[in-house]
C-alpha cells in the first residue's frame, strides 16, 4: 500500500516514506528516512541540524490518518489534526536517521478519534504523544 493512496498530502508536506503495517481502524506503522535535503533543514547551520519538533508531530498525525483512512467507510474522507495532548520529546533527530512511527487508535466515535503515537529511531524513543483526529462528514 502506497502512502499517496491513503493520505492527500504531497511533497513537501507528505512526510511518510513508506507504510510498514496497517490494521484498519486499529493502528498503523510508517517509516521516514531523514535526509539532509529536507526543507526544514535549509535554514539551519551545518553543525546544528536537527528535525524541528512540529514536524515529528506531523509524522505521527499522518501515521494516524493512515490507520483511519484505511477503513473502507472512511477512505477518501478528509481528516484534520484536532490536537495534541501529552507530547513528550526525548531526543533530537538528525539527518541520516530512520524513524519508525507507530500510532494506535484508542477511541473512535463518529467523526472524532483519538490515538497514542510513538516515534522511535534505532530502538530509542524520540517522541510520544496523544493525538486527536477529526473527520469531515
Question: What are these model-predicted stretches?
Answer:
Residues 1-4, 127-137:
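Segments adjacent to and within acyl-thioester-processing domains across lipid
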Residues 11-51:
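Catalytic strand-loop segment that frames the active site of acyl-thioester-processing enzymes
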Residues 14, 25-29, 98-100, 112-114, ...:
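Intrinsic-disorder/low-complexity, polar/charged segments enriched in Ser/Thr/Lys/Arg/Asp/Glu/Gln
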Residues 19, 86-122:
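Hydrophobic beta-sheet segments that form the core/acyl-binding groove
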Residues 34-36, 107, 121, 133-135:
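Beta-strand elements of well-folded, non-transmembrane domains
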Residues 43-66, 81:
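Compact, glycine-rich, soluble single-domain proteins
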Residues 64-102, 126-130:
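Hydrophobic beta-strand-centered segment that forms part of the acyl-chain substrate-binding groove
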Amino acid at each position: 500500500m502506497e502512502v499517496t493512496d491513503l493520505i492527500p498530502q504531497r511533497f513537501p508536506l507528505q512526510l511518510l516514506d513508506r507504510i510498514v503495517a496497517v490494521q484498519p481502524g486499529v493502528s498503523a506503522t510508517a517509516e521516514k528516512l531523514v535526509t539532509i535535503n529536507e526543507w526544514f533543514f535549509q535554514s539551519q547551520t551545518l553543525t546544528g541540524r536537527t528535525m524541528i519538533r512540529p514536524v515529528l508531530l506531523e509524522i505521527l498525525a499522518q501515521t494516524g490518518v493512515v490507520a483511519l483512512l484505511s477503513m473502507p467507510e472512511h477512505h477518501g474522507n478528509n481528516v484534520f489534526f484536532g490536537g495534541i495532548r501529552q507530547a513528550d520529546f526525548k531526543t533530537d533527530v538528525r539527518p541520516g536517521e530512520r524513524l519508525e512511527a507507530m500510532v494506535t487508535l484508542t477511541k473512535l466515535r463518529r467523526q472524532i478519534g483519538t490515538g497514542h503515537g510513538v516515534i522511535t529511531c534505532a530502538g530509542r524513543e524520540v517522541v510520544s504523544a496523544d493525538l486527536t483526529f477529526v473527520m469531515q462528514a
